[in-house]
Amino acid sequence: MTKQIIVTDSTSDLSKEYLEANNIHVIPLSLTIEGASYVDQVDITSEEFINHIENDEDVKTSQPAIGEFISAYEELGKDGSEIISIHLSSGLSGTYNTAYQASQMVDANVTVIDSKSISFGLGYQIQHLVELVKEGVSTSEIVKKLNHLRENIKLFVVIGQLNQLIKGGRISKTKGLIGNLMKIKPIGTLDDGRLELVHNARTQNSSIQYLKKEIAEFIGDHEIKSIGVAHANVIEYVDKLKKVFNEAFHVNNYDINVTTPVISAHTGQGAIGLVVLKK
């Protein structure tokens, strides 16, 4: 049977230990801080990146160069292995499109998948992909199963600082100033892989209550398999959220990590990314 190799980027919020233990090849995004370039999760950690945001430094993220994908695909596929390359949503980054272009320029057998998500929304798809590869499922069938899994995943983002949204052009300076004065915390979700702001909360507690309501509506009669929480240096907020969700949904499985710089660069210090995987 043909060997299958998994490739992804640095935005899944899965631990380095998990990625290494399952032989997942990571092609990282790049970060620019005050004009200096860093390789995500290689030259700088998520925690260190958030420190720069807290200091209100100019931060940007950029997708990997196409040459990095070409080199990886050629090396990994030279023995005839199939490559399954899964990446953060094409609605948030050009990474998927670059990976796809690279796949068309090499002789290797590469299938590129748009996860339509990020953070643990991508991470849970990778975990499922790992299990499917172990079971010997064909690549074409894997694509179908991941499409189905995506229907059971919902991602929310609670914005920490409006400054990052202003810098990114998502809201005007005037709206941002008013929002900061009123301490508004916008909440967004992914709609077909694109971030849409759907609610404005005034406090942490009100944001948690809104998320509880939305999650209850999303899961319906289903149980929750896992909740992933990626935070930008606000573990107290995460603890509050867990307490409410434990009472409401009897959740046993949480995955918690500091969020990927691709999220924190746009949402600021104090943000969380919440991903629900229902059974």
UniProtKB/Swiss-Prot annotation:
This is DegV domain-containing protein MW1315. GO terms for molecular function: lipid binding. Gene3D superfamilies: 3.30.1180.10, 3.40.50.10170. Residues 4-278 form the DegV domain. Keywords: Lipid-binding. Pfam families: DegV. InterPro entries: DegV (IPR003797), DegV_C (IPR043168), DegV_domain_contain (IPR050270). May bind long-chain fatty acids, such as palmitate, and may play a role in lipid transport or fatty acid metabolism. Hexadecanoate binds at residues 61, 93.
